[in-house]
Regions:
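Conserved beta-strand hairpin/beta-sheet module of binuclear metal-dependent hydrolase folds
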Residues: 275-319, 418-437
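Zn-dependent metallo-beta-lactamase
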Residues: 242-297
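N-terminal mature ectodomain segment of secretory-pathway/periplasmic proteins
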Residues: 37-40, 44-131, 159-167, 309
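Gly/Pro-enriched, hydrophobic low-complexity segments
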Residues: 170-261, 419-424, 431-432, 437-438, ...
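Flexible, processing/modification-adjacent segments and terminal tails
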Residues: 27-36, 107-186, 192, 203-210, ...
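Divalent-metal (often Zn2+) His-rich catalytic cores of metallo-beta-lactamase-fold enzymes
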Residues: 456-488
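Bacterial N-terminal signal peptides
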Residues: 10-21
């Protein structure tokens, strides 16, 4: 019998007895024992703050080129700062593309740096020294504070964890399970060296519902001050690889930690600024992503349900004020990327049919029928049956007076199911994630942006008579200004 099994043999017997009704309090007591041993080994007990740096690759979760398929690979560097005492986290992240196809906000060439942070129930980014409130990130960032070797020990001790045992190959692992209410569920697998080998968690996703995240830790080293930390980290999200990192530096209990919630982020609320583009057509702006409301004879069409419940609910509320008495019957989705589809469940809860390219239908059918138990959202609470309509490369919806068209952007680099929305009567084009006009006084670049080339080629191929562009990101502008950016 190895040392670990000698130490936990009594615990294993106790765990076996749970089958016959061992009280939950006994399971919690035994879990506390294995957690305290891991805490002593890893230096978690007196660890208040942690800074670590790592580099490797990331894959853009929720940003595939094809719905449900491979995620876009990135080159990735991170310095993560965690404040366990104040439940705060700040990531200084630098990303660049390792391949051109797929989503994410990184440019086709060069790097992008930003800070991604959360403190309590407030999240924000810092881009070029500017604060960008982002409460949609709270649900994904709060778990990051605790779903790491030291954090999971602290969270498990606080949340009355229970203990079971599994054998994997020739290894015996203690499995500590607990729930952080409304945030995540977790299982921490602890080996005979009292190290956290992996954490299996379920976190809430606006698109996927209960989303599994598995993080593996290996090659622990002593980084000083009695703190051990893994040298390698691998993470998968919803069954797809999302991180492979090598840790280069760890600073336990550093005096450099001061994560302060900016006032602009603390006071942020989702608001919608509506503007009339034509009779019965409104731009719904006020955030990072726009939506559009289109009035039909006896119903309303909404273009784009982005981000998460709170944003899309604000859009719904504003739409009802602008177009009273006409239900939102259709929600047109430009593509599957999480930031553009995070509110489709909210619209489905409203009773709208989700309209998307046929290549996305199976993906949305699975996603929107998944359980949503960790943090029940509007869709879960509504208990509505979701209707997803997959359409071909061209789709026309009309009431006899106004027509709304959807067109596939063929050969798009961003996503192969990317749709544009066109209103022929108004000569208005709605597009997502394509470039806009050049800054005032700027000259067209010698090498055109491939996104821009493909965008204009598609408009020309379809022979769309476009006067005005209403982008999902940014302000409306003349299409002539887009063509000027290409030198036309």
């Amino acid at each position: 019998m190895n040392k670990f099994n000698q130490r936990v043999s009594v615990l294993a017997v106790a765990a076996t007895f749970t089958i016959f009704g061992l009280p939950a309090v006994a399971q919690q007591y035994e879990a506390a024992g294995i957690l305290k041993r891991a805490a002593n080994n890893l230096g978690a007990s007196d660890l208040n703050t942690l800074i670590y740096s790592a580099a490797g690759n990331a894959w853009g979760a929720g940003q595939p080129y094809t719905a449900g398929k491979a995620l876009p690979k990135q080159n990735y560097r991170i310095t993560r700062t965690i404040d366990y005492v104040n439940s705060a986290l700040s990531d200084d992240v630098t990303r660049s593309r390792a391949e051109p196809r797929g989503g994410t906000a990184e440019p086709l060439t060069g790097e992008r740096n930003l800070i991604e942070a959360v403190g309590g129930n407030v999240a924000w980014n810092v881009v070029n020294m500017n604060i960008a409130p982002g409460n949609r990130y709270v649900a994904e960032r709060v778990p990051l504070i605790w779903l790491n070797p030291h954090g999971v020990i602290k969270a498990a001790l606080k949340n009355n964890a229970t203990l079971t045992f599994v054998t994997e190959g020739k290894k015996s692992l203690g499995v500590v399970s607990f729930t952080e209410p409304g945030r995540f569920t977790a299982k921490a697998y602890i080996n005979d060296a009292a190290e956290v080998e992996r954490i299996e968690a379920v976190v809430p996703s606006p698109v996927l519902g209960d989303m599994p995240v598995v993080t593996r830790y290996s090659e622990y080293r002593d980084f000083g001050r009695g703190v051990k930390f893994p040298s390698r980290i691998e993470e998968s999200t919803a069954g797809q690889m999302t991180l492979q990192l090598v840790v280069t530096d760890v600073q336990p209990n550093s005096g450099k930690v001061a994560i302060v919630v900016p006032p602009a982020a603390a006071s942020f609320k989702e608001t919608v600024a509506s503007s009339k583009l034509a009779d019965g057509v409104w731009m719904l702006a006020g955030g990072s992503h726009n939506s559009l409301a289109i009035e039909m004879k006896d119903h309303t069409v909404l273009v784009e349900a982005p981000l998460y419940d709170a944003r899309s609910q604000a859009v719904i509320d504003e739409t009802k004020k602008l177009i009273p008495g006409k239900p939102i019957r259709f929600a047109l989705n430009t593509h599957v990327h999480f930031d553009h589809s995070g509110g489709v469940g909210t619209l489905a809860a409203e009773g709208a049919t989700i309209v998307t390219h046929q290549s996305n239908k199976a993906y949305f059918d699975r996603a929107l029928s998944a359980k949503r138990t960790v943090s029940p959202d509007a869709l879960a609470k509504s208990k509505k049956k979701v209707v997803v309509r997959g359409v071909g490369d061209k789709f026309v919806h009309t009431d006899g007076n106004r027509s709304v068209e959807m067109h596939l952007m063929k050969d798009a680099i961003h996503n192969d199911g990317l749709m544009m929305v066109y209103l022929p009567k108004e000569k208005l084009l709605i597009q997502a994630d394509m470039p806009g006009p050049l800054p005032a006084g700027a000259k067209p670049p010698a090498k055109p942006n491939p996104y821009l080339v493909n965008y204009i080629q598609n408009v020309d191929r379809l022979k769309l008579a476009v006067d005005t562009v209403a982008p999902i990101h940014g302000a409306t502008h003349p299409f002539a200004e887009v063509k000027r950016a290409l030198g036309n």
